[in-house]
Each structure stands twice: as C-alpha cells, then as structure tokens.
C-alpha cells in the first residue's frame, strides 16, 4: 500500500452534576457533589470505523470536598468514588469480550483522593505564591484505557510533550509550583517541579516504567481589560524510564476569554 493511513477518533461526553454546601463557617466549607457521566468514543482508519475500539460507557460519581483557610493559605481536600454502570445504552468494553488475559471492565470502581495548597507569602518587598496539587487514584479492578490514570502531560507531570504517557489503573502525582508576582499587575513568573507514579497492569503487557519527573518554567496572568487569561511555558523531563520517548524540551500555551 502506497500512501498515508489516517487514524482518527471522535468522542462525545455528557456530565450532569449536582452539588450542595453542607457545612460553612468563617474558616472553610464542605461540599457534597454527585454526577452522572456518559461517554462515547469511536476510532477510524481512513473513513472505516474500528468497531472493536468503539466505547460507550456510563458511570455515577459521589464526592466530598473541603476547603479550609489558615491565615493567607487555602487548603483543599477531597475524595470521590466512581462506579461504572450499564445505564443509557452503555456497552461492555471490548476487553470484557475477548479472552486476552486482561480482565479490565467498563464497570469501573475508582476511588480518587485530592489535596491542594495555595500559600501567598512575601520575602522583603517581593510577593510569592506556592501551590501544591496532589491526586491519587486507586481501583480494585483493572481499568480500561479511558479510566486509567495517565501521567506525562501538562495536567499531571509537566515537562513532557504528552504524545506518550504512562498509564495504569492506579497511581499518583504531585505538582509543585513557586510563582513570583512581577512588577506588572496580575502577571506571574513561575517554576514548577512534578513527580508521579503509576502501578498495576496498563493493558495485557508490562508497563514500560512506573515513574516520571519533570520541570517547567512559565509566565501566566490576566489582562482584565480584555477579559483574557494566558499561560505560556516551557518544560523538560527530569527523570523517565529507559525507552520512554519524548521531546527534550516542550513549549506550550493556553488562552481563555471571558465576557
């Protein structure tokens, strides 16, 4: 065959949720939340659908979040439980239908813990801010790829291009960011260092590795007059498994507009 083969995918997501503040005082608040999720994924080679990769899943989620204020610092913590269902025409995962030795199921049972810290402080006449974000995912059953924890992108362990990740049914990561308030209003320069690990089976094969570490530097801020927020950054891997291919330096940016 001469020519390029085009691999593409389409996804649809619907998430309906409710939340209620069940406790509030001067030092913090506690929120109970619930949601129902429906997701459909279809993949194609050229214009022909790969039917064994079609997914239609649904799940319910119940979570509890707490925010607490200590001086200038804000501490967040949360826990949630997600359970896969057969609601709304959800289909069994193809891993459930084929005897490949990997008993992953779309009827997932996922427990997720989160924690965060936002601490503004001053050194001399300079203003700084330290941020920490932590997430741990645990599961009693092997998970299909959409439900696995994947590390190695701008949302988990920064410094990687995101073209390849480490994915498995359980794991954790922590992001650490130190930001300096520049003389320009609402503009921050920041440095970050992240680390993450995954465990369990990722599919029918053995994981390439179990941990990643990366660093990042960037500039972010708001342009209030235009309703714009931006984040421009560059990052690099600090530690990765042998054979894990990624760019030695990664650049990226994001822009959002509110009106």
Give the location of each predicted region.
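Extended, charge-rich C-terminal regions with high alpha-helical propensity
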Residues: 1-4, 219-220, 225-227, 237-239
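Short, solvent-exposed loop/turn segments at secondary-structure boundaries
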Residues: 2-5, 48, 203-206, 242-246
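C-terminal outer-membrane beta-barrel translocator/porin domains of Gram-negative envelope proteins
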Residues: 44-195, 199-201, 240, 253-256
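Outer-membrane beta-barrel "beta-signal"
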Residues: 217-223, 247-259
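Conserved active-site loop/cleft motifs that coordinate metal ions or position small ligands
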Residues: 190-192, 227-235
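Outer-membrane beta-barrel transmembrane domain signature
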Residues: 195-216
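Solvent-exposed loop/turn segments connecting transmembrane beta-strands
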Residues: 9, 166-170, 209-210, 238-249
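Transmembrane beta-barrel wall of Gram-negative outer-membrane proteins
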Residues: 1-66
């Amino acid at each position: 065959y001469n020519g390029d083969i085009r691999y593409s995918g389409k996804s649809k997501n619907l998430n309906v949720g409710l939340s209620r503040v069940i406790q509030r005082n001067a030092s913090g608040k506690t929120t109970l939340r619930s949601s129902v999720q429906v997701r459909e994924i279809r993949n194609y080679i050229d214009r022909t659908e790969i039917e064994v990769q079609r997914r239609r899943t649904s799940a319910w989620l119940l979570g509890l979040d707490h925010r607490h204020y200590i001086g200038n610092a804000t501490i967040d913590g949360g826990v949630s439980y997600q359970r896969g269902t057969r609601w709304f025409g959800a289909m069994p995962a193809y891993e459930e239908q084929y005897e490949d030795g990997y008993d992953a199921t779309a009827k997932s049972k996922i427990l997720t813990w989160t924690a965060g810290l936002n601490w503004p402080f001053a050194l001399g006449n300079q203003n700084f801010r330290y941020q920490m974000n932590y997430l741990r995912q645990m599961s009693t059953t092997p998970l299909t790829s959409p439900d696995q924890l994947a590390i190695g992108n701008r949302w988990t362990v920064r410094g990687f291009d995101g073209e390849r990740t480490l994915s498995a049914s359980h794991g954790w990561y922590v992001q650490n960011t130190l930001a300096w308030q520049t003389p320009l209003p609402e503009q921050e320069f920041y440095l970050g260092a992240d680390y993450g690990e995954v465990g369990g089976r990722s599919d029918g094969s053995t994981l390439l590795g179990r941990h990643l570490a990366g660093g990042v530097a960037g500039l972010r801020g708001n342009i209030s007059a235009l309703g714009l927020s931006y984040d421009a950054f560059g990052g690099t891997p600090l530690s990765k498994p042998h054979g894990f291919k990624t760019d030695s330096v990664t650049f990226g940016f994001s822009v959002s507009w509110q009106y």
